[in-house]
Amino acid sequence: MSRKYFEEEVIQQTLDYNYAQHSDADKFNIAYGIDKNFLFGCGVSIASVLLANPEKALAFHVFTDFFDSEDQQRFEALAKQYATQIVVYLIDCERLKSLPSTKNWTYATYFRFIIADYFSDKTDRVLYLDADIACKGSIQELIDLNFAENEIAAVVAEGELEWWTKRSVSLATPGLVSGYFNAGFILINIPLWTAENISKKAIEMLKDPEVVQRITHLDQDVLNIFLVNKARFVDKKFNTQFSLNYELKDSVINPVDAETVFVHYIGPTKPWHSWGAYPVSQYFLQAKSNSPWSHCALLNPVTSHQLRYAAKHMFNQKHYTSGINYYIAYFKRKLLE
Protein backbone atom coordinates (compact mmCIF):
# COMPACT_ATOMS: atom_id res chain seq x y z
CA MET A 1 0.00 0.00 0.00
CA SER A 2 1.30 3.44 -0.94
CA ARG A 3 2.43 5.62 1.94
CA LYS A 4 1.88 8.73 -0.20
CA TYR A 5 -1.27 10.80 -0.10
CA PHE A 6 -0.20 12.81 -3.14
CA GLU A 7 1.03 10.87 -6.15
CA GLU A 8 3.13 12.62 -8.78
CA GLU A 9 0.09 13.28 -11.02
CA VAL A 10 -0.53 16.46 -8.99
CA ILE A 11 2.60 17.87 -10.65
CA GLN A 12 1.50 19.16 -14.06
CA GLN A 13 4.83 20.48 -15.29
CA THR A 14 8.46 20.55 -14.16
CA LEU A 15 11.00 23.21 -15.14
CA ASP A 16 14.60 22.33 -14.27
CA TYR A 17 17.12 25.18 -14.33
CA ASN A 18 20.32 23.28 -13.61
CA TYR A 19 23.56 25.24 -13.76
CA ALA A 20 25.16 23.39 -10.83
CA GLN A 21 28.60 21.82 -10.97
CA HIS A 22 27.79 19.27 -8.23
CA SER A 23 26.27 15.82 -8.66
CA ASP A 24 22.70 15.27 -7.44
CA ALA A 25 23.91 12.91 -4.70
CA ASP A 26 25.95 15.69 -3.08
CA LYS A 27 23.20 18.31 -3.03
CA PHE A 28 21.30 19.50 0.04
CA ASN A 29 17.67 20.00 -1.01
CA ILE A 30 15.67 23.08 0.01
CA ALA A 31 11.98 23.37 -0.90
CA TYR A 32 9.31 26.09 -0.95
CA GLY A 33 5.53 25.82 -1.40
CA ILE A 34 3.97 29.07 -2.65
CA ASP A 35 1.23 30.80 -4.62
CA LYS A 36 1.82 33.72 -7.02
CA ASN A 37 1.86 36.29 -4.19
CA PHE A 38 5.07 34.81 -2.79
CA LEU A 39 7.11 34.27 -5.98
CA PHE A 40 9.00 37.55 -5.47
CA GLY A 41 9.78 36.64 -1.86
CA CYS A 42 10.74 33.09 -2.80
CA GLY A 43 13.24 34.17 -5.45
CA VAL A 44 14.93 36.57 -3.05
CA SER A 45 14.87 33.97 -0.25
CA ILE A 46 16.76 31.55 -2.52
CA ALA A 47 19.23 34.33 -3.37
CA SER A 48 19.78 34.99 0.35
CA VAL A 49 20.63 31.33 1.03
CA LEU A 50 23.08 31.28 -1.88
CA LEU A 51 24.63 34.61 -0.87
CA ALA A 52 25.24 33.40 2.70
CA ASN A 53 26.39 29.93 1.64
CA PRO A 54 28.77 30.20 -1.30
CA GLU A 55 30.40 27.00 -2.55
CA LYS A 56 27.81 24.75 -0.88
CA ALA A 57 26.15 22.05 -3.02
CA LEU A 58 22.49 23.08 -2.92
CA ALA A 59 19.36 22.40 -4.96
CA PHE A 60 16.15 24.43 -4.66
CA HIS A 61 12.66 23.14 -5.36
CA VAL A 62 9.74 25.56 -5.83
CA PHE A 63 6.21 24.09 -5.76
CA THR A 64 3.66 26.60 -7.05
CA ASP A 65 0.38 26.90 -8.94
CA PHE A 66 1.47 29.96 -10.98
CA PHE A 67 4.62 30.66 -12.96
CA ASP A 68 4.60 33.02 -15.94
CA SER A 69 7.27 33.80 -18.54
CA GLU A 70 8.71 36.65 -16.46
CA ASP A 71 9.09 34.31 -13.47
CA GLN A 72 10.76 31.74 -15.73
CA GLN A 73 13.31 34.29 -16.92
CA ARG A 74 14.15 35.49 -13.41
CA PHE A 75 14.41 32.08 -11.74
CA GLU A 76 16.57 30.75 -14.56
CA ALA A 77 18.77 33.87 -14.34
CA LEU A 78 19.09 33.27 -10.58
CA ALA A 79 20.19 29.66 -11.11
CA LYS A 80 22.70 30.82 -13.71
CA GLN A 81 24.01 33.70 -11.56
CA TYR A 82 24.84 31.42 -8.63
CA ALA A 83 25.64 28.24 -10.63
CA THR A 84 22.96 26.31 -8.77
CA GLN A 85 19.90 24.18 -9.54
CA ILE A 86 16.33 25.46 -9.21
CA VAL A 87 13.49 23.11 -10.10
CA VAL A 88 9.96 24.52 -10.40
CA TYR A 89 6.91 22.26 -10.10
CA LEU A 90 3.51 23.44 -11.37
CA ILE A 91 0.85 21.97 -9.08
CA ASP A 92 -2.77 20.97 -9.69
CA CYS A 93 -4.46 22.35 -6.57
CA GLU A 94 -7.99 20.96 -6.96
CA ARG A 95 -7.62 18.42 -4.14
CA LEU A 96 -6.43 21.16 -1.78
CA LYS A 97 -9.16 23.74 -2.35
CA SER A 98 -11.67 21.94 -0.13
CA LEU A 99 -9.31 22.18 2.86
CA PRO A 100 -9.63 25.04 5.39
CA SER A 101 -7.99 28.37 4.55
CA THR A 102 -7.86 31.88 6.06
CA LYS A 103 -7.09 35.45 4.99
CA ASN A 104 -3.39 34.89 5.74
CA TRP A 105 -3.10 31.19 4.80
CA THR A 106 -4.24 29.96 1.39
CA TYR A 107 -4.31 26.34 0.19
CA ALA A 108 -0.63 26.82 -0.77
CA THR A 109 0.19 26.12 2.89
CA TYR A 110 -0.59 22.47 2.14
CA PHE A 111 2.07 22.24 -0.59
CA ARG A 112 4.51 21.06 2.08
CA PHE A 113 2.65 17.73 2.12
CA ILE A 114 3.06 17.41 -1.65
CA ILE A 115 6.76 18.23 -1.16
CA ALA A 116 7.28 15.49 1.44
CA ASP A 117 5.43 12.92 -0.67
CA TYR A 118 7.27 13.88 -3.86
CA PHE A 119 10.66 13.29 -2.25
CA SER A 120 9.63 10.04 -0.52
CA ASP A 121 11.63 7.87 -2.92
CA LYS A 122 14.23 10.45 -4.00
CA THR A 123 16.21 11.66 -0.98
CA ASP A 124 16.52 11.27 2.79
CA ARG A 125 16.14 14.88 3.86
CA VAL A 126 14.52 18.07 2.61
CA LEU A 127 14.59 21.48 4.26
CA TYR A 128 11.19 23.16 3.88
CA LEU A 129 11.25 26.97 4.19
CA ASP A 130 8.51 29.58 4.02
CA ALA A 131 9.16 32.14 1.28
CA ASP A 132 9.18 35.03 3.78
CA ILE A 133 12.47 33.80 5.25
CA ALA A 134 15.82 35.46 4.53
CA CYS A 135 19.11 33.72 5.24
CA LYS A 136 22.04 35.56 6.82
CA GLY A 137 24.31 32.75 7.99
CA SER A 138 25.74 29.32 7.31
CA ILE A 139 23.42 26.31 7.06
CA GLN A 140 26.29 23.80 7.45
CA GLU A 141 24.94 22.70 10.84
CA LEU A 142 21.71 21.60 9.16
CA ILE A 143 23.56 19.84 6.36
CA ASP A 144 25.55 17.90 8.99
CA LEU A 145 22.56 17.13 11.25
CA ASN A 146 21.94 13.43 11.89
CA PHE A 147 18.46 12.40 13.00
CA ALA A 148 17.90 10.06 15.92
CA GLU A 149 15.88 6.90 15.29
CA ASN A 150 12.47 8.35 16.14
CA GLU A 151 12.90 11.93 14.87
CA ILE A 152 10.60 12.78 11.96
CA ALA A 153 11.76 16.39 11.67
CA ALA A 154 13.93 19.14 13.09
CA VAL A 155 11.95 22.26 14.02
CA VAL A 156 12.17 25.49 16.01
CA ALA A 157 9.95 26.25 18.99
CA GLU A 158 7.49 29.12 18.72
CA GLY A 159 6.74 31.14 21.85
CA GLU A 160 7.30 29.99 25.42
CA LEU A 161 5.74 27.65 28.00
CA GLU A 162 2.54 29.70 28.38
CA TRP A 163 1.82 29.47 24.61
CA TRP A 164 2.73 25.78 24.49
CA THR A 165 0.36 25.08 27.37
CA LYS A 166 -2.49 26.92 25.62
CA ARG A 167 -1.90 24.97 22.41
CA SER A 168 -1.74 21.67 24.32
CA VAL A 169 -5.19 22.37 25.80
CA SER A 170 -6.76 23.72 22.57
CA LEU A 171 -5.43 20.81 20.53
CA ALA A 172 -6.06 18.18 23.23
CA THR A 173 -2.41 17.11 22.97
CA PRO A 174 -0.73 17.20 26.42
CA GLY A 175 2.74 16.58 24.98
CA LEU A 176 2.77 20.06 23.43
CA VAL A 177 3.62 21.55 26.83
CA SER A 178 7.18 20.48 25.97
CA GLY A 179 7.18 22.64 22.85
CA TYR A 180 5.06 23.89 19.95
CA PHE A 181 6.83 24.69 16.68
CA ASN A 182 6.41 27.11 13.80
CA ALA A 183 6.02 25.22 10.51
CA GLY A 184 7.86 27.81 8.40
CA PHE A 185 11.07 25.88 8.97
CA ILE A 186 11.02 22.07 8.88
CA LEU A 187 13.98 19.83 8.16
CA ILE A 188 12.11 16.68 7.13
CA ASN A 189 13.42 13.17 7.74
CA ILE A 190 11.79 11.82 4.57
CA PRO A 191 11.97 8.03 5.22
CA LEU A 192 10.37 8.32 8.67
CA TRP A 193 7.79 10.91 7.53
CA THR A 194 6.79 8.46 4.80
CA ALA A 195 6.80 5.42 7.09
CA GLU A 196 4.58 7.26 9.60
CA ASN A 197 2.21 8.33 6.78
CA ILE A 198 2.26 11.95 8.01
CA SER A 199 0.91 13.61 4.85
CA LYS A 200 -2.10 11.32 4.59
CA LYS A 201 -2.90 11.50 8.31
CA ALA A 202 -2.61 15.29 8.31
CA ILE A 203 -4.88 15.80 5.29
CA GLU A 204 -7.47 13.40 6.70
CA MET A 205 -7.44 15.30 10.01
CA LEU A 206 -7.88 18.60 8.16
CA LYS A 207 -11.07 17.19 6.62
CA ASP A 208 -12.57 16.43 10.04
CA PRO A 209 -15.09 19.19 10.96
CA GLU A 210 -14.50 18.68 14.70
CA VAL A 211 -10.76 19.17 14.30
CA VAL A 212 -11.23 22.22 12.05
CA GLN A 213 -13.26 23.87 14.83
CA ARG A 214 -10.34 23.44 17.25
CA ILE A 215 -7.39 24.47 15.10
CA THR A 216 -6.35 28.07 14.50
CA HIS A 217 -3.06 27.54 12.65
CA LEU A 218 -4.26 24.98 10.07
CA ASP A 219 -1.58 22.48 9.06
CA GLN A 220 0.87 23.88 11.61
CA ASP A 221 -1.45 22.76 14.42
CA VAL A 222 -1.98 19.38 12.79
CA LEU A 223 1.75 18.82 12.29
CA ASN A 224 2.38 19.68 15.92
CA ILE A 225 -0.16 17.03 16.93
CA PHE A 226 1.44 14.30 14.79
CA LEU A 227 5.06 15.19 15.53
CA VAL A 228 4.70 15.53 19.31
CA ASN A 229 7.68 13.79 20.93
CA LYS A 230 8.93 12.91 17.43
CA ALA A 231 10.62 16.19 16.47
CA ARG A 232 14.00 17.58 17.41
CA PHE A 233 13.94 21.20 18.58
CA VAL A 234 16.94 23.08 17.21
CA ASP A 235 18.23 26.55 18.06
CA LYS A 236 15.99 29.57 17.41
CA LYS A 237 18.69 31.00 15.15
CA PHE A 238 17.21 28.76 12.44
CA ASN A 239 13.78 30.41 12.62
CA THR A 240 14.10 33.84 14.23
CA GLN A 241 10.62 35.28 13.89
CA PHE A 242 9.83 38.97 13.61
CA SER A 243 6.74 40.75 12.33
CA LEU A 244 7.33 44.12 10.68
CA ASN A 245 4.04 45.15 12.27
CA TYR A 246 5.80 44.98 15.65
CA GLU A 247 7.44 48.23 14.50
CA LEU A 248 4.07 49.92 15.10
CA LYS A 249 4.39 49.29 18.85
CA ASP A 250 5.82 51.86 21.25
CA SER A 251 8.66 49.53 22.16
CA VAL A 252 10.27 47.05 19.77
CA ILE A 253 12.74 44.28 20.58
CA ASN A 254 14.56 43.01 17.51
CA PRO A 255 15.49 39.34 18.10
CA VAL A 256 17.86 39.15 15.13
CA ASP A 257 21.51 38.98 16.20
CA ALA A 258 24.92 37.90 14.91
CA GLU A 259 24.07 34.22 15.43
CA THR A 260 20.80 34.31 13.47
CA VAL A 261 20.77 32.11 10.36
CA PHE A 262 17.17 32.54 9.15
CA VAL A 263 15.07 35.69 9.68
CA HIS A 264 11.38 34.79 9.34
CA TYR A 265 9.23 37.82 8.51
CA ILE A 266 5.94 36.59 9.96
CA GLY A 267 2.71 38.59 9.76
CA PRO A 268 0.97 40.37 6.87
CA THR A 269 3.61 43.04 6.20
CA LYS A 270 6.59 41.66 4.28
CA PRO A 271 10.00 43.15 3.42
CA TRP A 272 8.99 43.21 -0.27
CA HIS A 273 6.18 45.65 0.59
CA SER A 274 6.91 49.33 -0.01
CA TRP A 275 5.73 50.19 3.51
CA GLY A 276 8.04 47.67 5.23
CA ALA A 277 11.19 49.83 5.20
CA TYR A 278 12.85 49.07 8.54
CA PRO A 279 16.42 48.08 9.50
CA VAL A 280 15.40 44.45 10.05
CA SER A 281 14.37 44.26 6.36
CA GLN A 282 18.01 44.68 5.33
CA TYR A 283 18.62 40.92 5.02
CA PHE A 284 15.91 40.62 2.39
CA LEU A 285 16.93 43.84 0.62
CA GLN A 286 20.60 42.85 0.46
CA ALA A 287 19.68 39.55 -1.21
CA LYS A 288 17.27 41.35 -3.55
CA SER A 289 20.06 43.66 -4.71
CA ASN A 290 22.17 40.57 -5.48
CA SER A 291 19.51 38.84 -7.55
CA PRO A 292 17.59 39.18 -10.84
CA TRP A 293 14.95 41.08 -8.82
CA SER A 294 17.42 43.90 -8.06
CA HIS A 295 15.63 46.41 -10.30
CA CYS A 296 12.10 45.35 -9.32
CA ALA A 297 10.17 47.90 -7.30
CA LEU A 298 8.85 46.88 -3.91
CA LEU A 299 5.14 46.08 -4.05
CA ASN A 300 2.57 48.80 -3.35
CA PRO A 301 -0.60 48.07 -1.35
CA VAL A 302 -3.53 46.65 -3.29
CA THR A 303 -6.12 45.28 -0.85
CA SER A 304 -7.92 47.31 1.82
CA HIS A 305 -6.04 45.27 4.43
CA GLN A 306 -2.71 46.31 2.89
CA LEU A 307 -3.77 49.95 2.45
CA ARG A 308 -4.64 50.20 6.14
CA TYR A 309 -1.26 48.80 7.21
CA ALA A 310 0.57 50.94 4.65
CA ALA A 311 -1.09 54.05 6.12
CA LYS A 312 -0.10 53.07 9.67
CA HIS A 313 3.50 52.38 8.67
CA MET A 314 3.80 55.63 6.70
CA PHE A 315 2.74 57.59 9.79
CA ASN A 316 5.14 55.53 11.90
CA GLN A 317 7.95 56.37 9.46
CA LYS A 318 6.88 60.05 9.51
CA HIS A 319 5.82 60.02 5.84
CA TYR A 320 2.60 61.83 6.70
CA THR A 321 1.43 62.76 3.19
CA SER A 322 1.74 59.16 2.02
CA GLY A 323 -0.04 58.03 5.18
CA ILE A 324 -2.98 60.34 4.53
CA ASN A 325 -3.16 59.24 0.88
CA TYR A 326 -3.19 55.59 1.88
CA TYR A 327 -5.95 56.19 4.44
CA ILE A 328 -8.06 57.94 1.78
CA ALA A 329 -7.46 55.02 -0.61
CA TYR A 330 -8.31 52.59 2.19
CA PHE A 331 -11.68 54.21 2.92
CA LYS A 332 -12.53 54.39 -0.79
CA ARG A 333 -11.70 50.70 -1.17
CA LYS A 334 -13.81 49.77 1.87
CA LEU A 335 -16.82 51.51 0.32
CA LEU A 336 -16.50 49.29 -2.75
CA GLU A 337 -16.25 46.03 -0.79
Swiss-Prot record:
Disruption phenotype: The mutant has no detectable galactosyltransferase I activity. Mutant synthesizes truncated outer core region, does not express the O antigen and cannot invade epithelial cells. LPS contains one galactose and one glucose unit. UDP binds at residues 33-38, 130-131, 264-270. Can also use Ca(2+) or Mn(2+), with lower efficiency. The keyword Magnesium applies. InterPro entries: Glyco_trans_8 (IPR002495), Glyco_transf_8N (IPR013645), Glycosyltrans_8_dom-fam (IPR050748), Nucleotide-diphossugar_trans (IPR029044). GO terms for biological process: lipopolysaccharide core region biosynthetic process. Mg(2+) binds at residues 130, 132, 264. It comes from the Bacteria. Its cofactor is Mg(2+). A motif (DXD 1) lies at residues 130-132. Optimum pH is 8.5-9.0. Signal peptide: none annotated. Inhibited in a competitive manner by closely related nonsubstrate lipopolysaccharides. Pfam families: Glyco_transf_8 (PF01501), Glyco_transf_8C (PF08437). GO terms for molecular function: lipopolysaccharide 3-alpha-galactosyltransferase activity; metal ion binding. A motif (DXD 2) lies at residues 219-221. Pathway: Bacterial outer membrane biogenesis; LPS core biosynthesis. It catalyses: UDP-alpha-D-galactose + [lipopolysaccharide] = UDP + 3-alpha-D-galactosyl-[lipopolysaccharide]. The keyword Glycosyltransferase applies. Its EC number is 2.4.1.44. Keywords: Glycosyltransferase, Lipopolysaccharide biosynthesis, Magnesium, Metal-binding, Transferase. Belongs to the glycosyltransferase 8 family. Galactosyltransferase involved in the biosynthesis of the core oligosaccharide region of lipopolysaccharide (LPS). Catalyzes the addition of an alpha l,3-linked galactose (galactose I) to the first outer-core glucose (glucose I). Cannot use UDP-glucose. Activity probably does not require the branched galactose added by WaaB, but it is higher in the presence of this branched galactose. This is Lipopolysaccharide 1,3-galactosyltransferase.
